[in-house]
Amino acid sequence: MYAVFQSGGKQHRVSEGQTIRLEKLDIATGETIEFDQVLMIANGEEINIGAPLVDGGKIKAEIIAHGRGEKIKIVKFRRRKHYRKQQGHRQWFTDVKITGISA
């Protein structure tokens, strides 16, 4: 059984027991969360596709950890003008473990 849901402006395909990394959620570690923006649920041969959302579809998950991703560097450079600019960025994330999928 797997499902596709939307969180943080992105769509994720998950199955029960899977751990995924989402955009930062303001929920404490160890708490549970319920995602209700479920786009599709597949259970064997039975596939339930929403238009746009599945009625009554819910995904339960547990917050495992919060953190920051690896640093990326943004570099701006103009040739012959002695112009160089460098900036770094680390994106916040939340790791969640999918505990249940229901339609």
From Swiss-Prot:
Disulfide bond annotation, renumbered to this chain: none
Coiled coil: none
Entry GO CC: cytoplasm; ribonucleoprotein complex; ribosome
The keyword rRNA-binding belongs to this UniProt entry's keyword annotation: yes
Keywords: Ribonucleoprotein, Ribosomal protein, RNA-binding, rRNA-binding
Example GO BP: translation
GO MF terms held by the record: rRNA binding; structural constituent of ribosome
Keyword RNA-binding: yes
Leader peptide range in chain numbering: none
Domain of life of the source: Bacteria
InterPro entries for this protein: bL21-like, bL21-like_sf, Ribosomal_bL21, Ribosomal_bL21_CS
Free-text function comment from the UniProt entry: This protein binds to 23S rRNA in the presence of protein L20.
Protein family: Belongs to the bacterial ribosomal protein bL21 family.
Self-association state and partner proteins as the record states: Part of the 50S ribosomal subunit. Contacts protein L20.
Name of this protein: Large ribosomal subunit protein bL21
